[in-house]
Curated annotation (Swiss-Prot):
Transmembrane segments: none annotated. This is Peptide chain release factor 1. It comes from the Bacteria. GO terms for cellular component: cytoplasm. Methylated by PrmC. Methylation increases the termination efficiency of RF1. The modification N5-methylglutamine is found at residue 238. It is found in: Cytoplasm. It comes from Mycoplasmopsis pulmonis (strain UAB CTIP) (Mycoplasma pulmonis). Keywords: Cytoplasm, Methylation, Protein biosynthesis. The lineage of its organism: Bacteria, Bacillati, Mycoplasmatota, Mycoplasmoidales, Metamycoplasmataceae. Pfam families: PCRF (PF03462), RF-1 (PF00472). Belongs to the prokaryotic/mitochondrial release factor family. The gene is prfA. Peptide chain release factor 1 directs the termination of translation in response to the peptide chain termination codons UAG and UAA. The keyword Metal-binding does not apply.
Length: 359
């Protein structure tokens, strides 16, 4: 292992051990915000620290075996020591390659939960129904992975599904697993109302944004906000509340809009709408920064939310992700077995990073 790599790993391991000690301190245990901050830092370097610890243990074993070789006369012990050295060297060589991968640049938001926004797009009623199907797909995936789904806002469509639904998925590295879902999802199928059996094409747009926690500052000037209230509506568009409890917030400088009617009061809806707005503004700034330094990768495509990323072909029972030219069973994917696509996308991301840093 190169000395520079060894020193980097040693610094990370020292930090990991330091954070473990910090998390045991009473002042940290009593401060939820600080505890969450340290826990997130710890989790972000846990894997690499554990693998480097294994490397160091193999290093110590080799040193001990070399002492045996230098001092022992017994041929059997010498043979065992040589064998152990060879085995440890092989394992260390393998670990070096793993550690190179773990040292690759990481998205600072990967540890966060995710806010998903799905909108029915081209195709009228069928697009809205498909938006509902996508929500069910992500909900089933979350359930399969012991993650929690919480709806922040939704507008029911008259023929089923949603014109818009916004929800969080909370769980281990939720954003890292769903960040490549942003883009246009296209569906090809025969609508229930189609009498001639023709296949229709419709689309829904998905936006995946990191959920902002207390550690991340998003500056919002109250004077930049336009806040409107309106009555909550349910399925079919009927009013479900006699008071103006739903809240819509417009960020005037960017034109970004967020809303919520899921809460039981205007106050709770305002908090939810503000939560969505913060995520949108944070995501907006991140997109601008990436665009400025030209860091869009193949998986992010052009960075445009209008880019078609996936097709769901019902007649052929096939889902195709166009960015990696990967196809899978539609039935399984819609049942929430999305991990096969997620893993393929993450593998492609890793390959791109390796190419960039020249490993």
């Amino acid at each position: 292992m190169e000395k520079s790599m060894y020193n980097s790993l040693k610094s990370i391991l020292d930090k990991y051990q330091e954070l473990n000690q910090e998390l045991l301190k009473p002042e940290v245990l009593s401060d939820i915000k600080l505890y969450k901050k340290f826990s997130r830092e710890l989790n972000s370097i846990k894997s690499i620290s554990e693998e480097f610890s294994k490397y160091l243990n193999y290093e110590k074993t080799i040193e001990s075996s070399k002492i045996i070789l230098a001092q022992e006369k017994d041929e059997e012990l010498i043979s065992l020591a040589k064998k152990e050295i060879l085995e440890c060297e092989e394992k260390m060589s393998s670990l070096v390659e793993e550690l190179k991968i773990l040292l690759l640049p990481k998205d600072k938001n990967d540890e966060l939960d995710v806010i998903m926004e799905i909108r029915g797009a081209a195709g009228g009623d069928e697009a809205n129904i498909f938006a509902g199907d996508l929500f069910e797909m992500y909900s089933k995936w979350a359930n399969n992975n012991n993650m929690k789904v919480s709806v922040l806002d939704r507008n029911y469509a008259t023929s089923g599904g949603f014109t818009l639904i916004v929800f969080t998925i909370s769980g281990e590295k939720a954003y890292s697993k769903l960040k490549f879902e942003s883009g246009v999802h296209r569906v090809q199928r025969i609508p229930v109302t189609e009498s001639k059996g023709r296949v229709h094409t419709s689309t829904a747009t998905v936006t995946a944004m990191p959920e902002i926690d207390d550690d991340i500052e998003v500056e919002i000037n109250p004077s930049d906000l336009k806040i409107d209230t309106f009555r909550s509506s349910g399925a079919g568009g009927q009013s479900v509340n006699t008071t103006d409890s739903a809240v819509r917030i417009t960020h005037i400088p960017t034109g970004i809009i967020s809303s919520s009617q899921e809460g039981r009061s205007q106050i709770s809806n305002r908090e939810l709408a503000l939560k969505i707005l913060k995520a949108k503004l944070y995501d907006h700034e991140n997109q601008k920064k990436l665009e400025k330094v030209g860091q869009y990768r193949k998986l992010a495509g052009s960075g445009a939310r209008s880019e078609k990323i996936r097709t769901y072909n019902y007649p052929q029972d096939r889902v195709t992700d166009h960015r990696i030219n990967f196809s899978s069973s539609l039935k399984q994917i819609m049942e929430g077995k999305l991990q096969i696509i997620i893993d393929s996308l993450l593998a492609e991301e890793q390959a791109e990073k390796i190419k960039e840093v020249g490993i």
